[in-house]
Amino acid sequence: MAEKEVPLTAVKVEALVVMKIIKHCSQTFPTTATGSIVGMDAEGTLEITNSFPFPVVEMPAESHFDNTAPNPAAAAPRAKANTVYQAEMIRMLREVNVDANNVGWYTSANMGNFVNMNVIENQYFYQKEMNERTVALVHDVSRSAQGSLSLRAFRLSPKFMAAFKENKFTAEELQKSGLRYQDIFVELPVEIHNSHLITTFLHQLQCPRQSAPTDLPPSLAALESGPFVKDTILAPNYDNLSLSIDPFLEKNCDLLLDSIETHNTETNNFQYYQRSFTREQTKINQWIAKRKAENASRATLKQPPLPEDEWQRLFKLPQEPSRLESMLNSRQVEQYARQVDSFVSATTGKMFAVKGNLLPGETAK
């Protein structure tokens, strides 16, 4: 185990673990899938060597007035029953001589919608109760379906951990600490690792060569059904050539607009609080000024003064709402915007590649 002083700089995931996570998340999609990951910390690199899913446990409501729909799978990592289950699984893995150090948990996402209170509370629980050097692996199922694997590793920043522990997310506290929505997560680079035996096996696989040059296929379907693709397991993945832009981009834009609308709602609520606070503060100041004038007149008449702190019983200042939800929503807006930007930039190259076939009178150069 690496020393505590060495900061985590990267995450190395075994290919078998990646396949197990992909299988679990795909089978439960669109329901959230969560599980535990084990491995070891080697000189600042978190090596993940095994994983197992969490059973879904019903979480009790926090209060009788909590009418929100529960999400047992998303809250499973911090459930008490799953904590016992995880400890028992790690004990059994240790008995068969497998790396059995708790290094975090994984969760599935859809369109990058992982910035929420469940993920925050789960990761806070792991970094505070389990092991400070733990990560959350996020596998985006819908993004991976576009042809490229989406697997990211996150930790909560020390600044956010301190603020979440104190539960101080007022505007004044955020200004003092300098905490921004960009400071919620710390992302670590992810590297997928294969064993030397698997790498050697892949290099020894025979790849048939084409005996003679063939004509270019007229469509992607013809390319995928060609004899070269059917005869070898090392055929390239043609999902990256797909031009189905509308579904993914349209859904991302819808989610982005919803998040912006939520952000505007949070802003309006905070502005309403500020107006209410200013109105009540004005009433208090007027009452105090009136009481001071009354005490001054009573002093001239040699009468005892009236208490000037009686306003605390007569007036009640509104409580400032927490800015945590607004911060999470701002971080989610940034996530959706980055996804749209990355998807459009990747698709632009494809559009230029097929420009000659789309526009009459032009040929690809």
From Swiss-Prot:
Q: Where in the cell is it found?
A: Cytoplasm
Q: What sequence ranges are listed for the domain MPN?
A: 11-160
What is stated as this protein's family in its record? Belongs to the eIF-3 subunit H family.
Species, as recorded: Aspergillus terreus (strain NIH 2624 / FGSC A1156)
What protein name does the entry list? Eukaryotic translation initiation factor 3 subunit H
Tell me the classification of the organism that encodes this protein: Eukaryota, Fungi, Dikarya, Ascomycota, Pezizomycotina
- Pfam families in UniProt: eIF3h_C (PF19445), JAB (PF01398)
Q: What InterPro entries does the record point to?
A: eIF3h, eIF3h_C, JAMM/MPN+_dom, JAMM_MPN+_peptidase_M67A, MPN
Gene Ontology terms: biological process: formation of cytoplasmic translation initiation complex
Molecular function per GO: metallopeptidase activity; translation initiation factor activity
Keywords, in A-Z order: Cytoplasm, Initiation factor, Protein biosynthesis
Per the record, the major location class is cytoplasm
The UniProt transmembrane annotation reads none
What does UniProt give as GO cellular component? eukaryotic 43S preinitiation complex; eukaryotic 48S preinitiation complex; eukaryotic translation initiation factor 3 complex
